[in-house]
């Protein structure tokens, strides 16, 4: 997370990191208050999946939109983790927290498989 919860990884209803020009376009098209509502309450996994903000529900749904939302989340998790591992010049462990981190075993496994290059392995 950066200045606000809108930065960083995509969340249930928050966009995560987004190009500043996209925000300017949203403001031009929708106004400031509506844009704030869109980015904070109608984006993230909810917007990507077409209506589901909870990873548990996404994992139970076989739709292409839900699969895309999960793939997007895993991809950006890998990008963030990779940049942090590089900045720290390695790592000793990864701890998953929060609802997704604690309960979404499949999502954790997908992310960790993508970090095998850094010596990461799944330890359940």
PLM regions and their residue ranges:
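Glycine-rich phosphate-binding loops at beta-strand->alpha-helix junctions
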Residues: 92-110, 114
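Glycine-rich phosphate-binding/hydrolytic loop that grips phosphoryl groups
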Residues: 124
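Glycine-rich phosphate-binding loop of actin/hexokinase-like ATP-binding domains
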Residues: 1-28
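Generic structural signal for well-ordered, non-membrane alpha-helical segments
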Residues: 15-16, 20, 32, 66, ...
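Alpha/propeptide regions of enzymes that mature by internal proteolysis
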Residues: 68, 114-118
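Adenine-nucleotide phosphate-binding core of ATP-dependent small-molecule kinases
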Residues: 37, 44-48, 54-87
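Oxyanion-binding "anion nests"
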Residues: 19-51
